[in-house]
Amino acid sequence: MKRKILIYLKYTFYCVLIIIIVCIGLLFYSGNSVKYNRNYGINSDSLAGEGPYIVYQHDQVRQVYLKGSKAEGYALDEKIVQDSVVEVHVNYYPDQSSFKVQLPIYKHYMPEAAVYPEPEKLLVISDIEGGFAAFRSLLIANGVMNETYGWTFGKGHVALAGDFVDRGYFVTQVLYLIFHLEQQALQAGGKVHYILGNHEIMNMQGDHSYAVGKYAYAATLLGIQQAQLYAGDR
């Protein structure tokens, strides 16, 4: 009886080992293209429509989008900004949705208060990590905004407790949505608080070990270092 059990375990071990080897082989055969994606399985490495990046350079302000494709190559679609407020269009290309942001060209930054009165309602979110689709769904489900990106939280406050960058493929869109909601919340008497997490600080200090490769490519196309994507003049 013991001998039969040992034989059974032996063959089970070899079967499992063969399955593991075949799976690893399939991954390499597919060009290592299988990857975890927090945006519902959408291939989101593309830089098409990425941006806009607002770049202060030589006393000029440039508004830059990236256009093109992996097959044809990428190029910059840019213009010089003359106004003190720029209307930018932010695209989430997997489902072709977009929203507009009125972006002031800041010359001075005012520090935020550290203490606020208790709001009538409060939502705390953290660790979105560039997952735009999940962030959008969470905000809609909790009544913070509607499906057209309009603030619906009244005088409520939303506290963003860090780590909204890194790992995901749509960090730019996430950051613009935060800024968009900050503006709308103020108009309604509400407030969005963005507290830096360790991943925001890592990026600003030049540690991009958790960032996806597309942002290194974006910085190269813009002619800047990756850390400068989040600099005070971007």
Which residues are covered by each model-predicted region?
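Feature recognizes metal-dependent phosphohydrolase scaffolds
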Residues: 2-234
